[in-house]
């Protein structure tokens, strides 16, 4: 093969490879002196019934490209208190490390995971640890709503998704709600990642983890700041230790100087955890 032909072929392969890597639902803008950094991903929206209070909004997106034979694996991301996910646009000056939540959405979409972000009641907080409802969760509108979200995934409402490969993550109230998936939706999730949260019924320093957790509790990753003043690190550790004691797969990442926030390390660690549990 002539050298010129070989070089042209190599150049074409490099260009095509770069184009494939560049294809994304998301765009980024670097930080400047006058503007914060931004990551923004396109999204779709829909509404589903949540029982007595009517419908709630869900935003979602599927990856680019052709889905695998069984459909895209899917990650449910649960909002923290008072910070609704109205879109997938995030700036680096957001509180609680919100920018890194955006990087997580980007990372998941770019690596073949669909992302679904349901809304908490009135965009406020999840009912998983509200006194009264925490002990009778099946009476909550969250239970109705999230059951409808899971049914919609299975029916193809969000596109070609794989209901056998469902994952969940979230921060703060959304972290507690991630734990709720293990308690009230058994067998539905392959793995969980709890950011700055703990067991489903805990609330900040008010935290008692049951002596016996569900035997089919999904593998769970915890990401927590050691100096978190909202959800103390030790409250997460109670949950982590209980999983270890029962022989349930778990892992823990501690940000030594981290507070109540997403971390720069969060997107990569959550993706790796989900990848490890296909």
UniProtKB/Swiss-Prot annotation:
Tree of life domain: Bacteria
Catalytic activity annotation: Hydrolyzes the polyester poly{oxycarbonyl[(R)-2-pentylethylene]} to oligomers
Keywords assigned: Hydrolase, Secreted, Signal
Broad class of where this protein is predominantly found: secreted
InterPro entries linked: AB_hydrolase_fold, Plant_Biomass_Hydrol_Est
Compartments, record wording: Secreted
Keyword Membrane: no
GO CC term, one of those recorded: extracellular region
Catalytic activity, EC: 3.1.1.76
GO molecular function terms listed in the Swiss-Prot or TrEMBL record: poly(3-hydroxyoctanoate) depolymerase activity
Protein function: Hydrolysis of poly(3-hydroxyoctanoic acid).
Name of the protein this chain belongs to: Poly(3-hydroxyoctanoate) depolymerase
Organism the protein comes from: Pseudomonas fluorescens
Name of encoding gene: phaZ
